[in-house]
UniProtKB/Swiss-Prot annotation:
S-S pairs: none
Gene3D superfamilies noted in UniProt: Jelly Rolls (2.60.120.10)
Pathway the protein acts in: Amine and polyamine biosynthesis; ectoine biosynthesis; L-ectoine from L-aspartate 4-semialdehyde: step 3/3
HAMAP family per UniProt: Ectoine_synth (MF_01255)
Keyword Lyase part of the UniProt annotation: yes
GO biological processes: ectoine biosynthetic process
Lineage of origin: Bacteria, Pseudomonadati, Pseudomonadota, Gammaproteobacteria, Oceanospirillales
InterPro entries: Ectoine_synth, RmlC-like_jellyroll, RmlC_Cupin_sf
Organism, as annotated: Marinomonas sp. (strain MWYL1)
Example of a GO MF term: ectoine synthase activity
Gene: ectC
Protein known as: L-ectoine synthase
EC number assigned by the record: 4.2.1.108
Length: 129
């Protein structure tokens, strides 16, 4: 058993800020923790929107605070995001995420990430060992 403090992790390399300034994410659980998934607290800054397509990972996202929407780039279907809503990318869905108000999200990735991943040109994380 172990415990981690979000505020303490935010002071370490577990906190990652996107190169484009759209988001930041503190990775509380990573592949090295041997849980079979990774767990992150991610902030999407107000007014930001961007395309992602996790071709190598499945993701579920729970909204803690803020407001936005996620749109399927395949179907155009939109889901409103607000506190208490979970959205699930269960088919490696290409999607656009929009933050109308700053979003604070709890994210779970399977397979787990190592913490060194950055989005590639298609908005995906590569599998890193």
């Amino acid at each position: 058993m172990f415990a981690r403090d979000l505020a303490e992790c935010e002071k370490t390399e577990r906190r990652v800020v996107s190169p484009d300034g759209n988001w930041e994410s503190t990775r509380l659980l990573l592949k090295e923790d041997n849980m079979g998934f990774s767990f992150h607290i991610t902030t999407i800054y107000e007014g930001k929107d961007f395309d992602m397509h996790y071709q190598n990972h499945l993701e579920s996202v729970y909204c803690i605070s803020g407001e936005g929407e996620v749109e399927s780039r395949e179907t155009g279907q939109k889901h409103h995001i607000k506190p208490g809503v979970v959205y699930v990318l269960d088919k490696h869905d290409a999607h656009t995420l929009r933050a109308f108000k700053e979003l604070k999200l709890a994210c779970v990735f399977n397979p787990p990430i190592t913490g060194k991943e950055v989005h590639n040109s298609e908005g995906a994380y590569e599998i890193l060992e």
